[in-house]
Amino acid sequence: MIRKIPSFIEVYKSLIQIPTISSNNKLLDQSNKNFIDLLSNYFSDLNFSVKNYQIPHTDKYNMLACVGSGNGGLLLSGHSDTVDFDEKKWTKDPFKLTETNNKFYGLGAVDMKGFFALILEVISSINIKKINKPIYILATANEETDMSGAKNFIQSTIIKPDCIIIGEPTSLKLINAHKGHMSYSIKVIGDTGHSSNPDHGVNSIEIMHDVIRSLLILKKYFKEEYQHPNFSIPYPTMNLSSIHGGSAINRICPLCILNFEIRPIPGLTLTQIEIVIKEKLETIMKKWSHRIFIKKLFSSVPAYECPHNSGTIKIVEKLCQLNSAAVNYCTEAPFLQRIAPTLILGPGSIEQAHQPDEYLEHYFIQPTKNIITKLINKFCY
């Protein structure tokens, strides 16, 4: 096949140099349109049909590229956005791909713009005219915040591939399950007053003490009632993350705020957790209904699992000579899993993601290309 796009390195450089930061801080959040436009052009040059979809009420976009027709096939998926960064902690330019010591440095180098560069490198070297089933490439928006890109995609798409591979950095280990994530903030409003007469007002810290006691009972309940042997920590976890209250030693505390998170295992739904939280806090909430307020901090992510008896897992395990495993971090898999069996498999280590001087090690390049080629050959030819 005659190459129609720049070299792997040139493509990789061009993807890194476009900022695509997603952040809940509006001052840091950026559109990914320029990145999506560039990626779309690359796939168009390789004879893919490309459609870009704007996420409603945002300046963020998804891209779906396709070559071939019919049912089934393979979907290779990744997110276009990165986290923000602390410039003081970086020793290299985050938006310039730097190759040194057998590593590629740059913001998004491993999480996960390198995966797109590798897909393009493989596609540019194979004869796509002979495929029997479609190859899909999905680039999503806002994975690093609310995952609205993946959520929007599954609501609108009609495609039904045989297999979805998300190229998150797994050190090329095959992942078929991960925990979910829920985060909450509880605010307790008390009374202000002089500490010389502490019974003259309601102390928010004292109410929060009862709230925490109820949450710790819930934490124990999760640990005792729910187990999944494939996880290194085999039960749902709860972490009381931060607590703030009070302003002076001689003042009744008028406000106390507690933030906490829960990481559910597969089999424990977000709805179940919400119901149990309400049950455990019901008594104290009724007693102090006008003083206790609870809200979600961020969009929740369900736990995910592609069952071991799935034919897709068996095919990919045999094809790549890998055994599937479970991890504790979150991806878009629970959403994409709703349209087709989904697995997570990609180059680089998760330990380098979201870190200063983020990098992808060079030795992942050829094995990743080999795996992508095998997947395309298996599901599309």
UniProtKB/Swiss-Prot annotation:
The active site is at D81, E143. The keyword Oxidoreductase does not apply. One of its GO terms (molecular function) is acetylornithine deacetylase activity. Pathway: Amino-acid biosynthesis; L-arginine biosynthesis; L-ornithine from N(2)-acetyl-L-ornithine (linear): step 1/1. Zn(2+) 1 binds at H79, D111, E168. Keywords: Amino-acid biosynthesis, Arginine biosynthesis, Cobalt, Cytoplasm, Hydrolase, Metal-binding, Zinc. Its cofactor is Zn(2+); Co(2+); glutathione. It catalyses: N(2)-acetyl-L-ornithine + H2O = L-ornithine + acetate. GO terms for cellular component: cytoplasm. SUPFAM superfamilies: Bacterial exopeptidase dimerisation domain, Zn-dependent exopeptidases. GO terms for biological process: L-arginine biosynthetic process. Pfam families: M20_dimer (PF07687), Peptidase_M20 (PF01546). It is found in: Cytoplasm. Zn(2+) 2 binds at D111, E144, H354. Gene3D superfamilies: 3.30.70.360, Zn peptidases. Belongs to the peptidase M20A family. ArgE subfamily. Homodimer. PANTHER family: ACETYLORNITHINE DEACETYLASE. This is Acetylornithine deacetylase.
